[in-house]
Amino acid sequence: MTIRLHDTNARQIRDFVPLTAGCVSIYLCGATVQAAPHIGHIRSGLNFDIMRRWFAYRGYDVTFIRNVTDIDDKIIAKSAEQGRPWWSIGYENERAFNDGYDALGCLPPTYEPRATGHIPEMIEMMRGLIERGHAYEADGNVYFDVRSLPGYLTLSNQELDDLRQPSGEGETGKRDQRDFAMWKATKPGEPSWETPWGRGRPGWHLECSAMAHKYLGSAFDIHGGGIDLIFPHHENEIAQATAYGDEFAKYWVHNGWVTMSGEKMSKSLGNSVLVSEMVKHWRPIVLRYYLGTPHYRSMIEYSEEALREAESAFARIEGFVQRVTEKTGEVVPPADEVPPAFAEAMDEDLGVPQALAIIHTTVRQGNSALAADDKEAAADRLAEVRAMLGVLGLDPLDPHWAGEGDRGEDLHGVVDTLVRLVLDQRQSARARKDWAAADAIRDQLNQSGLVIEDSPAGPRWTLGPR
């Protein structure tokens, strides 16, 4: 079946037809590194990580670009406020973003270009736009002439005459107040670069148009980002690129927000939950399940209750994986192919919720096989489950998650040793038929969040839901 994606520009789900057979090129607007990431930022990267994994499973050669905006007004303002170099703020937060992506199991991009490393490409694009009559210089600034492009605002489905001047775009010398800055003239104390029009720094929109052109050429398959980027950022990217002569992106794919009390999670609103704090209290694989299993276009309302539900749901999957592994005495490899129903769900606009239902159904079938002592059927179901989980980046037996890193593996070993000591005491109580003492030990372990299961091979423990 053909992969189908919701194209924001077409306002419908379309068949994906690559520009080059067997290849897919994706540009994702990545981090603006003025602060450490919250889970809303990481959700976007995670959604597109699932997309690239599915394309790879379907046999595509994937080129995935995720940029870093390492210079903008907020970074400069924070630099002045903290008395630190602008670049040190950017590098520190870029590392925090990459730590967050890695913690939640996102594969590294093919390239992750920084805006400040591509000033020559931006200058070349501005020169071309000025020559074509789509841009002009005024007082050291370079503006895009929005009235020069008839198709402007098609992506966001707006009318130019209804458009208000964007906030923060009150620079002098504009022909039309709706024209947007591609290059901002230098100001005292701000970083700047030399151009034919004087020293200055790039505007946000120019950066992505220039970097997408450099790494993916004049035409590429998919441009992605959060829905808040549709206007003005993506609209202005399209304007610059198409006026420059590029075909630019064939499909526009946007993910929903993480919200809190109905409002978008945002640094500026002060309602953000940092990834670095979340991973102290929740297993990263549970966070990935929580953020990655709703449909990418839906909103996720943040709550502790929803996280606990995700934790419980994943525990059922993980428990099945552990039980079959113990029963068979070996690590069952993933199947070569996912079940057809799972593939059908993923092909239809990355229908992860529907695909997840197939996983849970397969887990139930596997548990029934275990109950019937049918090891072969249980192993077959586990192979299917692992194949499906692998596509979603959620296979608990994947090396990335096995022990959840060295620190997690060490901690698990310490906890296992301590629990085994307590379980030995329980076994001794059972051996002398002191059932009250044995039950009391089990109850205390349960109250600590551990689930104890008695099996012919002896007691085993797992983490229970919170």
From Swiss-Prot:
<comment type="subunit">
    <text>Monomer.</text>
</comment>
<dbReference type="InterPro" id="IPR056411">
    <property type="entry name" value="CysS_C"/>
</dbReference>
<keyword id="KW-0547">Nucleotide-binding</keyword>
<dbReference type="GO" id="GO:0008270">
    <property type="term" value="F:zinc ion binding"/>
</dbReference>
<feature type="binding site">
    <location>
        <position position="237"/>
    </location>
    <ligand>
        <name>Zn(2+)</name>
    </ligand>
</feature>
<protein>
    <recommendedName>
        <fullName>Cysteine--tRNA ligase</fullName>
        <ecNumber>6.1.1.16</ecNumber>
    </recommendedName>
</protein>
<keyword id="KW-0862">Zinc</keyword>
<dbReference type="Pfam" id="PF09190">
    <property type="entry name" value="DALR_2"/>
</dbReference>
<dbReference type="GO" id="GO:0005829">
    <property type="term" value="C:cytosol"/>
</dbReference>
<feature type="short sequence motif" description="'HIGH' region">
    <location>
        <begin position="31"/>
        <end position="41"/>
    </location>
</feature>
<keyword id="KW-0479">Metal-binding</keyword>
<keyword id="KW-0067">ATP-binding</keyword>
<comment type="similarity">
    <text>Belongs to the class-I aminoacyl-tRNA synthetase family.</text>
</comment>
<feature type="binding site">
    <location>
        <position position="267"/>
    </location>
    <ligand>
        <name>ATP</name>
    </ligand>
</feature>
<feature type="binding site">
    <location>
        <position position="233"/>
    </location>
    <ligand>
        <name>Zn(2+)</name>
    </ligand>
</feature>
<keyword id="KW-0436">Ligase</keyword>
<keyword id="KW-0963">Cytoplasm</keyword>
<dbReference type="InterPro" id="IPR024909">
    <property type="entry name" value="Cys-tRNA/MSH_ligase"/>
</dbReference>
<dbReference type="Pfam" id="PF01406">
    <property type="entry name" value="tRNA-synt_1e"/>
</dbReference>
<dbReference type="InterPro" id="IPR015273">
    <property type="entry name" value="Cys-tRNA-synt_Ia_DALR"/>
</dbReference>
<feature type="binding site">
    <location>
        <position position="29"/>
    </location>
    <ligand>
        <name>Zn(2+)</name>
    </ligand>
</feature>
<feature type="binding site">
    <location>
        <position position="208"/>
    </location>
    <ligand>
        <name>Zn(2+)</name>
    </ligand>
</feature>
<keyword id="KW-0648">Protein biosynthesis</keyword>
<feature type="short sequence motif" description="'KMSKS' region">
    <location>
        <begin position="264"/>
        <end position="268"/>
    </location>
</feature>
<dbReference type="GO" id="GO:0004817">
    <property type="term" value="F:cysteine-tRNA ligase activity"/>
</dbReference>
<dbReference type="InterPro" id="IPR014729">
    <property type="entry name" value="Rossmann-like_a/b/a_fold"/>
</dbReference>
<dbReference type="GO" id="GO:0006423">
    <property type="term" value="P:cysteinyl-tRNA aminoacylation"/>
</dbReference>
<keyword id="KW-0030">Aminoacyl-tRNA synthetase</keyword>
<dbReference type="InterPro" id="IPR015803">
    <property type="entry name" value="Cys-tRNA-ligase"/>
</dbReference>
<dbReference type="InterPro" id="IPR009080">
    <property type="entry name" value="tRNAsynth_Ia_anticodon-bd"/>
</dbReference>
<dbReference type="GO" id="GO:0005524">
    <property type="term" value="F:ATP binding"/>
</dbReference>
<dbReference type="InterPro" id="IPR032678">
    <property type="entry name" value="tRNA-synt_1_cat_dom"/>
</dbReference>
<dbReference type="Pfam" id="PF23493">
    <property type="entry name" value="CysS_C"/>
</dbReference>
